[in-house]
Swiss-Prot record:
This is Neuromedin-U. One of its GO terms (molecular function) is hormone activity. Residues 21-104, 105-139, 140-142, 143-144, 171-175 form a propeptide. The keyword Secreted applies. Belongs to the NmU family. The keyword Signal applies. Stimulates uterine smooth muscle contraction and causes selective vasoconstriction.
Length: 175
């Protein structure tokens, strides 16, 4: 029974042959591509095809679709045309995503490294982080390094840290 159905399928494929390429061959090629792993999540290599086998397959699909799409006189079903358009869009989208990833990589990892000169601030830094050297200079002008400020309650401050003796003990300098 299956042999008869295979013969009718082959007859249909031979009826729709296009310049040496049959429509069934193109459909088979597109079905094989749909088995490859296309996902938005973690990378996963297909058990059916290796990475080196995918490029010739994509090139073959691209050639077949470019032979079918430009010629409106060919008797090709609208479903096949839509499938070719979908495959072409997927290919363009994946190339666009690779470009975006490359741009993102370059943005994060192309920061200029200073040669020890702390006066030069990088343009990649956040604007508030660029103010840190100025704040440090202002604080150093306000308080000298050996001067300690005494705050009521036994708190010693040198501008950066607060020191409070533990357990209520006070040093002799505070009495």
């Amino acid at each position: 029974m299956q042999k008869g159905s295979e013969d009718t399928t082959q007859n249909r494929c031979h009826q729709h042959s296009i310049g040496g390429h049959s429509t069934c061959g193109l459909l088979l090629l597109i079905i094989l591509v749909s088995w490859t792993s296309i996902c938005e999540g973690a990378p996963f290599s297909s058990p059916v095809l290796g990475a080196e086998d995918e490029l010739p397959l994509w090139n073959g699909i691209d050639d077949a679709c470019s032979a079918v799409l430009p010629d409106p006189q060919l008797a090709v079903s609208s479903t096949l045309r839509e499938l070719c358009f979908m495959v072409m869009r997927m290919q363009q989208k994946s190339q666009g995503e690779e470009k975006d990833d490359f741009k993102r990589f370059l943005f994060h990892y192309s920061k200029s490294h200073d040669s020890g000169n702390s006066d030069i601030t990088s343009s990649v830094l956040h604007p508030l982080l660029q103010l840190l050297p100025q704040l440090h200079d202002r604080r150093m002008k306000r308080l000298t390094s050996d001067e300690e400020v005494q705050v009521p309650g036994g708190v010693i401050s040198n501008g950066y840290f607060l020191f409070r003796p533990r357990n209520g003990r006070r040093s002799a300098g505070f009495r």
